[in-house]
Structure formats: structure tokens, C-alpha cells
Amino acid sequence: MRNQAIQRKNVLLAYTEEFFSKNTKKYYIVLFLLTVLWFVWWQSKNPSPDGYQNEYLHVGNAFDLWESLVAGDVRLLRWLMYTGYWPFGFYMLAWPTLLFGMTHSALLAMNIILLAGLFYLFYKHRKPASLLLFLLCPGVFGAMLRYEPNFANMFFLAVGLFALQKEGLANRKRALVWGLALGVGLMVDRLTLLFFLLPAVIPSLYKAPKDVWKNFAVGIAAMLLCTAAYYREFFLRHMGEIIPQISQGEIDSAGVIESIENPIPQLYYLFSLLDSQAGLFVGSFMLIQLVLTLWNRKNKAEWTLLFAFLPAMLFFTLLTKKQAFYTLPALVPLALLCTRTRWALPMVVGLGFVHFLALGCGTHTVGTTWFPASWVSPRHTLARPPTLEEWPYEEMFATVKTAPKEILVLSQDQQLYEGFLILRVREAFPHAKVRGVVLDPIGSVEFFREIDHFVWMGPPTGTWPTVGGIQAELIGDHYQLDELPDIAEKVANAQSQYQEIFSAPAENGTLHLFSRKP
């Protein structure tokens, strides 16, 4: 009996080794198509940007840059590129897909292109098991669904790490690829990749000959060529905002330091890895692989991955400000370190897939969180099921007979945020100027006479917004009413100037469209 059990175990190990060692194109193509099908399904059931993150801000910024580019307004384009809080490189990545239309969907198509690039990298370097574990991380498949820099960050980190895997900096072309990956990555998101890709070259530089140092200088020059102009402006404009957050912690949109009650902040990123970034099963397996790598004799490629992970984790742990997004790129080197104990892969992948069904599809809620809230505070939602919302946008826009020039938008709904509604209106009428009552009260007052259409998401029984209702929204967005022009009064008193051309129930409220009377 014992011999039979050993034989069955050996057969299982052999089958597992064979399956996860296969590096066939068919494996990658099938996995890629399944991932894309799920991506399309999820987006079809989730019509609004992610309400937990800054996605709507990134979408708006991308639209602004694209509109100025198409209009040939070089001065405005340059101003937007070099005065924005986020690097403009991230928005430029989506310019090819925006050729098919200025829409949220076109921006998200960029992530599909990056996903294809990741598949190619893992295929070329024969890492099928690492790719599968990587895709099962909530921090990865959640970031893939949003137009935010996190997924692009992971892509460029993978490009840089794979460039260092075989010869390190001994090959000048690979050193140049590393430098460009770091430079473009820094233009995708603020500074994040610096703490991952820069330490990754330490094993290559240790006792290295002069030629390696020359190649390193070439890589650094490529990085500076990509980043110097933007970061000069960035530090001049935002250094006063950055320094307090390093020492004091998170500061909200009202300028107030957020109180975070975490009894063990030193373990925040470790617990976040197991909770929301990789999940308990895949995350535990990754940490076991990390320990095994540290315990055993290491080659230069493994040292590179360790230096791409450990210094960054230490740096962000020492920072007072904590965010799970900062260490999301760490999932790349952790996945690439998963080369031992292959016999456990079927169980880990199976449990990781069950976790994916909960967070990625909403089939169940068991295991969506693993730790007490205080242990992972501040907790960020990195992945979630689709909202299944339905908004009658197409029916509403179909009632517009003449092309609008100035559109005012107001949302008093907790589900359909005004920023989301503005983006949808901009998609439908790309040549119109769209303003929000709450997001741009000063501009709304200044151009109020030019407004020809008014979109309002209100309560189920309302027929027109009231002064009190608008003021409540402004106060909720941290405005001081005595410092604002009379936008609430202007909108509330303008009912006689508009006629309603569309009204329909929408989720928990009613969506209205008004046009100015002739």
C-alpha cells in the first residue's frame, strides 16, 4: 500500500511538473483568450469607473490631453503635460487606442495590449507557472480592469527585470532596455518603480568590471532622458506637498491628516500582501518561495529578483504614509521566484482560482478578506466583482437633436458620482464643453448663460434640483459656501429657462436631461 501511495504521488508530481513546465504557445493563447473574455464580460457589467480609486481622474486627464493633441493646441498640451500631478507618459500610452474613439473603453484597451506584452515576456523566458500565479493575484487582475498606472507599472517592472535576468548589465542592449523600462515606468507613475528597478542592478554591479559600469551609465542616461524635464517641474511644484506626507502620513482632499489606527504598522505591507494584493493562498506560497530562495544558494538572477523586492519593501515600510498600491509591483519578482516546490502548484492554483471567482466574478463572498480591518488599515479595495449597474445613457443621448456646445452636469446620487457622469457625457459629445456643478462651481457660474443642456441625476421624486440639495453636495465635497459664487441659487432658479426632454428611473434615482428653451 505504501509503495502504491508513493507511486501515485510520483505520478502526480510528474504530471504537475510536465503541465507547469510546458511552454507551448497553445497554453499562453488559451490563457490569454480566457483572460480577455473575462475582462470584456466584467467591463460589460460595470459601466462606471472604479469608485474606490482615482480612475475617473485619470480618464479625465487622458481626455484633456487627447483633446488638446487632436486640436493641435501645443501650448495647452505642454501645460497639461508638465503641470499635472501624475506623469503624462501614462496617458500617452493610450493614444494609439484613442484613435478608435475618445472613450473609457478605448483607454482600457491599452491594458489588453500591456497584458499581451506580459504574456510574451513570460513565454519568451519560459515562466508559465509564474504567469498563472501572477494573474491570480487580486492586485493584478483588479488593476487590469482599471485605467490606472498600477498595471502599467507592473508591466514595465517585468520588462526591466527580464532584461537583467540572463546577462545583467553585461549586455549593453539589455542595459539600455533596463534604463528605458525604468524611465518610461517613472513617466507612468510617480517614482514608484525607482525603488524596485534601481536596486535590482546591485547584484550586476557587485565587483563588476568597467564595461558593466559603462552599460549602467547608458541605462541611467536613457532613464534621465525620459524623466528629467517632467520631474524638474514636478518637484518644483509639489515638493511642499510630498514632504509632509512622508513624515506625517495620508492627507485627504481637504488637507486634513487622516487618522489611521493600525496596531502593527510595521507589518502593514506583509499583511496587505496576504490580504488584498495576492490573497492568502497565492501570497503564502509566494512568501514560502521567498524564504526558500533566501535559505538556499542563489544565482545572480535570483539575487536580482530579491533586490527588486526587499529594498522597496523596507523603504515603504519605513514611510509613515501607507498605501497598498505602493508595493503592488512587488508581485512581479515574487511571482518569478516561484520556481520551487512545484508539487504544491495544483493546490495553490486551485485555491487561488476560488479566490478569483469571489473577487473577480462575485460567485461567493467567502475568503474575500482575511485579516482584521485594523491590521491592514488603511485598507484599499484592489479587486471586486462588477457592480451590475444599468444606466439609460444611450436612450438619453438619443433625445438630443442638435449638437450641444455647453453642458452642465449635476449628480446628487451616491452611486453615480458626478465625475463618472461627466466622463460619460464627454464621451457622447466630445466637441462640447462639459462642467460639473460640484466639481467646477466657479466655471459653472462663469459660463452659466452659455449652458444649452443640463444633465441631472437626482432623487426618485425630484423634478428640479433645490438650493439646499446643491449646497449639501458642495459641503460634502469640502467646499466653504461663503467662498463660492451663488451656483446653487443660479441652478435652482433656472428651471423656467429649460425644458425636460428625457427622464427615466436609474438604479436608486432618476436621470434627467434638460435643454434650454428657444
Language-model segments: residues:
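Membrane-proximal lumenal/periplasmic loop motifs of glycosylation machinery
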Residues: K45-Y56, L69-Y91, L99, S253-E258, ...
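Transmembrane-lumen/periplasm boundary regions of multi-pass, lipid-linked membrane glycan transferases
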Residues: N61, F196-L197, P203-R297, M313, ...
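Short acidic/glycine- and proline-prone juxtamembrane loop motifs at membrane-interface regions
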Residues: G142-N153, Q323-A324
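Membrane-interface alpha helices of multi-pass inner-membrane proteins
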Residues: R174-R190, V201, L225, L310-T317
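Membrane-embedded, lumen/periplasm-facing catalytic core of multi-pass transferases
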Residues: G350-Q414
